């Protein structure tokens, strides 16, 4: 019973198919894993392995007209798969938040940061505009953004990629969701901003007990951030292990290949020793 309570997010036998003109095509199959409270679960694999499809399925963001999602996805015991649009919108942003790889894609260019941030808060709370603005400013201060009141008046194109990503993290964390899904959150950033983003994610996890599903191809990031790791290949899970066990004693040949590829190109890891 205690294990069940500690599993904030549970995915069981997830199977996703997309309809094409040539018939049904399987994107992921037999996907099962659990994310515990206050833990970071790394989801790794090469491009096309099914990582993003898995995260989009959890968030119920795939096109339901062309995509069939089978299996169970529970968030704190509540089944997400099959919820209608209104029900899932109430959950997304409040109970489960999403940080995209490219922060510019997360914002509408014709509205200010403040307009989008404040409306996101108000759509999930009973706060008035002034209260929502105060919460937004507080959340932005927590991720060390300078002059939040001024930033709220800015448009997305006026901010750097690193600053936009920190705004996204502030938006994701401000309502203290039980789960944050971070899909390659550092890929588009320089080393300095990568470090800042990872530090803020770790701070959110430790302060709020937020669970994080961290999707990344960067094994250096995974080795420093994750408690457990899920390795995907061709739409399937090939290995699940504690992060230390995975790096010290990988079992599957594909996992060994990923680790060997990382070593063979002699990656510099400026982030790893600084977190």
Task: Name the predicted role of every residue range.
Residues 4-7, 24, 146-152, 240-275:
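Short catalytic/signature loops enriched in Gly
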Residues 174-178:
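A short, proline-enriched helix->beta-strand linker immediately N-terminal to the Walker B motif
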Residues 180-183:
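Catalytic Walker B motif of ABC-type/P-loop ATPase nucleotide-binding domains
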Residues 195-208:
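Helical segment within the ABC ATPase nucleotide-binding domain
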Residues 222-224:
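A short, surface-exposed alpha-helical micro-motif characterized by mixed small hydrophobic
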């Amino acid at each position: 019973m205690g294990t069940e309570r500690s599993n904030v997010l549970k995915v069981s036998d997830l199977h996703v198919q997309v309809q094409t003109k040539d018939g049904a095509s399987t994107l992921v199959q037999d996907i099962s894993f659990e994310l515990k409270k206050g833990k970071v679960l790394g989801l790794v694999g090469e491009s096309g392995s099914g990582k993003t499809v898995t995260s989009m399925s959890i968030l119920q963001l795939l096109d339901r007209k062309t995509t069939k999602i089978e299996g169970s996805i529970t968030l704190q015991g509540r089944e997400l798969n099959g919820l209608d649009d209104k029900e899932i919108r109430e959950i997304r942003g409040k109970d489960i938040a999403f940080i995209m790889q490219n922060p510019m894609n997360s914002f509408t260019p014709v509205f200010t940061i403040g307009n989008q941030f404040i409306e996101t808060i108000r759509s999930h709370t009973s706060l008035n505009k002034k209260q929502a603005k105060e919460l937004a400013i507080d959340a932005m201060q927590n991720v060390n953004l300078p002059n939040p009141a001024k930033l709220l008046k800015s448009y997305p194109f006026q901010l750097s990629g690193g600053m936009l990503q920190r705004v996204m993290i502030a938006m994701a964390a401000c309502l203290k969701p039980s789960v944050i899904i971070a899909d390659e959150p550092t890929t588009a950033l320089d080393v300095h901003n990568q470090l800042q983003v990872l530090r803020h994610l770790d701070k959110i996890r430790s302060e709020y007990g937020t669970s994080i599903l961290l999707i990344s191809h960067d094994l250096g990031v995974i080795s420093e951030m994750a408690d457990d790791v899920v390795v995907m290949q061709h739409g399937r899970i090939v290995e699940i292990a504690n992060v230390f066990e995975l790096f010290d004693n990988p079992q599957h040949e594909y996992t060994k290949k990923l680790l060997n590829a990382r070593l063979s190109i002699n990656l510099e890891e400026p982030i790893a020793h600084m977190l």
